Design a protein with these regions (language model features):
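DUTPase catalytic domain/fold
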Residues: 1-175
Length: 175
């Protein structure tokens, strides 16, 4: 059975997420009115996408970093889009670099470069990372959400359930 995923534009210039047959996730694109958006070093900004969605209640969307954003120091933060959420998707991106990241529209790059050194003066002349507005900023996986029953146990009862790891913590597997 094929599940239908529904997307809608919340802004006219938004791009509906795209996916090739062999890709796991849908590419999600930025959508903002300004010519560019700056993400200062070591800060997180929610990037608007101009899209909303709906899907069956037994699915959700999970946002993940793309390799093209990760190599630029753009870390995609948490991102679960529940089946019942109908608002615009916002993608939290953290700049892990010591210089600003500028998501810039193609037609604005020439103008942007003219005043970039003034705008970004504290970080040094023309010392920034340019990310094209036309590229996807994350990918969205459609994952099943199983319906489960919860059973309550005392902590002692829970620890008594067989487990290879038990209560051992980080690094305990030796892998």
């Amino acid at each position: 059975m094929i599940t239908t995923v529904k997307f809608a534009k919340t802004k006219p210039n938004a791009i509906i997420p795209t996916k090739r047959l062999e890709d796991a996730g849908y590419d999600v694109y930025p959508c903002f009115d300004e010519d560019y958006m700056i993400i200062k070093p070591h800060t997180t900004v929610i990037i608007p996408t101009g899209i909303a969605s709906a899907c069956d209640t037994d699915y959700c969307f999970v946002l993940h970093e793309r390799s093209s954003t990760g190599t630029k120091g753009m870390a995609q933060r948490c991102g679960i889009i529940d089946s019942g959420y109908r608002g615009e998707w916002g993608v939290p991106i953290t700049n892990t670099n010591d210089v600003p990241i500028v998501i810039c529209k193609k037609e604005s790059i020439t103008d942007f470069n003219d005043f970039a050194s003034i705008l970004l003066f504290p970080y040094g002349e023309a010392n920034y990372i340019l990310y094209p507005y036309e590229k996807a900023i994350c990918q969205a996986l459609v994952l099943p959400v199983p319906e489960v029953e919860i059973e309550k146990y005392t902590y002692e009862e829970l620890k008594a359930i067989l487990s290879e790891r038990g209560t051992d913590r980080l690094g305990s597997s030796g892998k």
